Amino acid sequence: MTQPQMAPICLVENHNEQLSVNQEAIEILDKISQPVVVVAIVGLYRTGKSYLMNCLAGQNHGFPLGSTVQSQTKGIWMWCMPHPTKPEHTLVLLDTEGLGDVEKGDPKNDLWIFALSVLLSSTFIYNSMITINHQALEQLQYVTELTELIRAKSSPNPAGIKNSTEFVSFFPDFVWTVRDFMLELKLNGEDITSDDYLENALKLIPGDKPRMQASNSCRECIRLFFPNRKCFVFDRPTHDKELLQKLDSITEDQLDPKFQEVTKAFVSYIFTYAKIKTLKEGIKVTGNRLGILVTTYVNAINSGAVPCLDDAVTTLAQRENSVAVQKAADHYSEQMAQRLRLPTETLQELLDVHAACEKEAMAVFMEHSFKDENQQFLKKLVELIGENKELFLSKNEEASNKYCQEELDRLSKDFMENISTFFVPCGHKLYMDKREKIEHDYWQVPRKGVKASEVFQSFLQSQAFIESSILQADTALTAGEKAIAEERAQKVAAEKEQELLRQKQKEQQEYMEAQEKSHKENLEQLRRKLEQEREQDIKDHDMMLKKLMKDQKAFLEEGFKKKAEEMNKEIQQLRDVIKDKKRNTDRIKEALLNGFSTVLFHYLVRYLKHL
């Protein structure tokens, strides 16, 4: 992103508790091809969320700050700008309307705002006031609803792995900001960090009371869904009530020094550690991809469905892969047009350029495509490249045929115009001398191309009757000499035909060898792509397993043995899935490659018919 967005714009509008996507905001995202770092903030209304986002934007003004008890932000607002510390990246700030606004009727509306913020962000900030206690955790009840609001897969996992277990592979990092914090950071008389404070607050507390179980449920969900957690505790910005009403217009030196210190640390942390938004299997999200995700999720919500990551990625893949196919096909056509000088001297010259351009086009597709089930889009690219290759072959033949015919017409012009002069005694020898001179001069012409022999052979065939007529009219020759000359002419014609046939067979062999080499290179690129996807898939499942085992150990240490034991079955199921993926990957990969080979063979047969 070269220029920052001048001001925030509403991304997801919330009118009468109905969510809709602002197309103007989508158009902004659609122009951003860079990877995006997406930072979203949620929290109760009137807790200063917008102020923190303006700090990240480096502006006093931007996201509106309210000075009354009414919530200022409605829906989800977006501000895009070049990332201040990561070149070639775009920072996307998402400010959300306050949760728990008494003026809103349906609490489900808050849940969707919360869920969308989680789905869209790479760093998720929860902003609250005063302290992290039972009340604060109860106010964060939305996190316990995520299993009902978000699905990782479009169908139940056949291995029995919970939907929520897969959240860790695509959920954002979690940052809890506590405002107007008045307590000392101490635990059992020892100084602790704000991170220690958060982790201690998230420990499960024994007890069967409903309120205790509710706050424990929230603690457990935060721990299970968000493995990477951070906490910042802020003093009051100022103790001057009047200044609090106009934070967007006061100078930095009017703010409390401790508040300034933590604010700077918070901004530095976000700029340094907030990651690129990624989906499962390591798919990096760009601005235009983010726009597709927003639209897909909001459409799902409005249709009464639950936003599903797999469905969103499939939608994304369909569009992105179509674009990748066109981008790769265009690259092939453009490079072929630039590098080829038609007509080429030989077929091999064209095939060499084709091979280089096809390899580059395949690399372009591999770079920009993902989740290409059954190589559907790769096969489409192979077909398009094949069609374009056939077009270049035809153009090359046409250019060669045209050039050869023009040169032959030029060289034989006087010869053809004065053909009658050969119907004289000794005319046959004069005719042959002149024709051989034309042939010699013709083969001296450079870069005639692949049709050179065929064009000259056609010329010779057109001269067969004329030569025979001149021969028969030559009174200087005996009947025997005429017969010998006739036989020699037929023999030369037959040899020329055989030579032309051998050339075509040679070109056919060159074509097949080039196609086989190209086939192997394409398969190798596909193999590398599948291998990368396999490694990323195993890596994602390994991360899930390590996270489950870490959580299980923590529950045991906190005395929740039963809860830890309940995790054994899922841990074993996850181990089995990983083992199966490692064991069966080669077989699955080869099946895919064999299917792709069949398609390539089909196109090979089709192109050979061209020769």
From Swiss-Prot:
Catalytic activity reported: GTP + H2O = GDP + phosphate + H(+)
GO process terms (BP): adhesion of symbiont to host; cellular response to interferon-beta; cellular response to lipopolysaccharide; cellular response to type II interferon; defense response to Gram-positive bacterium; defense response to protozoan; response to bacterium
Induction remarks: By IFNG/IFN-gamma, IFNB1/IFN-beta, LPS and CpG oligodeoxynucleotides. Up-regulated upon infection by T.gondii or L.monocytogenes.
Keywords, ordered alphabetically: Antimicrobial, Cytoplasmic vesicle, GTP-binding, Hydrolase, Immunity, Innate immunity, Nucleotide-binding
Subcellular location: Cytoplasmic vesicle
Binding positions for GTP per the UniProt entry: 43-50, 65-67, 95-99
Example GO molecular function: GTPase activity
Coiled-coil regions, chain positions: none
Region of interest (GTPase domain (Globular)), residue spans: 1-308
GO cellular component: cytoplasmic vesicle; symbiont-containing vacuole membrane
Domain of life: Eukaryota
InterPro entries according to UniProt: G_GB1_RHD3_dom, GBP_C, Guanylate-bd/ATL_C, Guanylate-bd_C_sf, Guanylate-bd_N, P-loop_NTPase
EC numbers: 3.6.5.-
Enzyme class: hydrolase
Gene3D superfamilies noted in UniProt: Guanylate-binding protein, C-terminal domain, P-loop containing nucleotide triphosphate hydrolases
SUPFAM superfamilies, A to Z: Interferon-induced guanylate-binding protein 1 (GBP1), C-terminal domain, P-loop containing nucleoside triphosphate hydrolases
Function: Interferon (IFN)-inducible GTPase that plays important roles in innate immunity against a diverse range of bacterial, viral and protozoan pathogens, such as bacterial pathogens Listeria monocytogenes and Mycobacterium bovis BCG as well as the protozoan pathogen Toxoplasma gondii. Confers protection to several pathogens, including the bacterial pathogens Listeria monocytogenes and Mycobacterium bovis BCG as well as the protozoan pathogen Toxoplasma gondii.
Similarity section: Belongs to the TRAFAC class dynamin-like GTPase superfamily. GB1/RHD3 GTPase family. GB1 subfamily.
Protein name listed in UniProt: Guanylate-binding protein 6
Organism field: Mus musculus
Gene this chain is encoded by: Gbp6
